[in-house]
Structure formats: C-alpha cells, structure tokens
C-alpha cells in the first residue's frame, strides 16, 4: 500500500521518502518545492502548497500511511506547525488513510515554556483526534548537517553550550519510523506516543565537538549556512529543553520497535 510523506522537501522528510523507496514500496511525496531526486528515484510527486487540503486529500487516495515531519526546532512561525497538521488531519480523514505517523519534541504540551513545544503539543492533540491509528514520535535533537550549521553559527553562549541534549542520528530516527509502521501494521485504532531519545546525554558543546564542529573562534563557520535572525530567535527559545522524555507513561520507541540507536559521531554523514 502507498505511503505519502508530507512536506517532502524538508531534509528529514526527504530522507524518509528515499528510504521507503529503497524498500521497494510505492511512495508519494507532497510538496511545493523541488524534489527532483525523489521523482528520479521513483516517487510520485504531488505538487501543492501545505494549506491546500483538497489537493492533499486527492494525493492521499488509497494511501495506507502518512508520515508528517512538521516544522523543526528553528521554525519561525510556531502557529504554522499547528495549521499544517490540521490540514494533514483533515485530508487524511477525508481520504480514509489507515495510519499516520508524526514527529514531535520531548516536553511538547500546552504548558511548555517555549512556543515551539506548545505548538507541538497542540499538534499532538490534533493527531490524537484523527480516527485512524496514529503514532507520535517525540524525537530529541536530530543530528543533521542543518542542525550542525544552525548550532555552529548561532553564537551560543557558554550557558547554552552547557545545555544537555540526547542527540539522535537522523538515520536511526528514519529506521525507527519505518519500524513503527511495520510494528503497528495490524492496529485498527488507537493513539501511541513514543520517545526517541539518543542513547547518550551530553552537552551541546560536547555534541558539536563529537560531530566535528570546532569551538567558537575556530574554523567552525567555514562552509556553513548562516541562519536568519528569526531562526536564531526561535532556536534560543527552544534550546532550554527538555531534550529527553522522563514520563513513564510514554513508551521508549527503540524498545517498542526493537531497535538500537547509536550516538552521533565523527564518522556520521547524516544528510539533511
């Protein structure tokens, strides 16, 4: 059965679609940006803006699973996180989709201290109300070149560099998403929230050193994309965490899906 990945131009979404194609399944990509590489790899690309619920519903015809990544930690308009998932929920319900998997953040909820986690919490509520089986994956800091660039060029203070995170490799998260889809293949109802923390907690400074990003004042900025002031402000809000899940009610996604993540390191080349 087909799988559709929303906002397939986003780095993690694009990589999820590419990995699904490697498994030989029918993959649809919904986006308003260029994803020529996915089209060349065999994906059916439906071009449309994120708020076109009618076009998205049409693209979802006969789709089994929707994977919705949503906005990231440097999203400059947190309200869009909610509006996007509302469109996806409406289209998925109208099309009779059988399962939806969405990414979120540790600590997402209405009383979170930062606007992105509050928006993610509201998005989780929208997902939970969808009539088909749904899965929310609360992923810690996802190690990608984009995240490395943002953190390397953000001018982090010493206090911010000492914040502890539980970074998760992009490739491990992608494999978890695919595994969760398989594990829940027979489910006909229910909402599941799982944690996807990295296996090792470390400071942001230690994480950057581990993935080869030099300290401030070094050559850390050479060849890196500079974030906009708006993205830097959004990042400053979200960095305070939490960056892992301690709630015993929330399942450990790795254990549930029988996966074992590895810590990010110098050998990683996580695309995105």
Please give the residue ranges for each predicted region.
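Conserved Rossmann-fold NAD(P)-dependent oxidoreductase catalytic core, especially the SDR/UDP-sugar
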Residues: 30, 65, 71-72, 77-130, ...
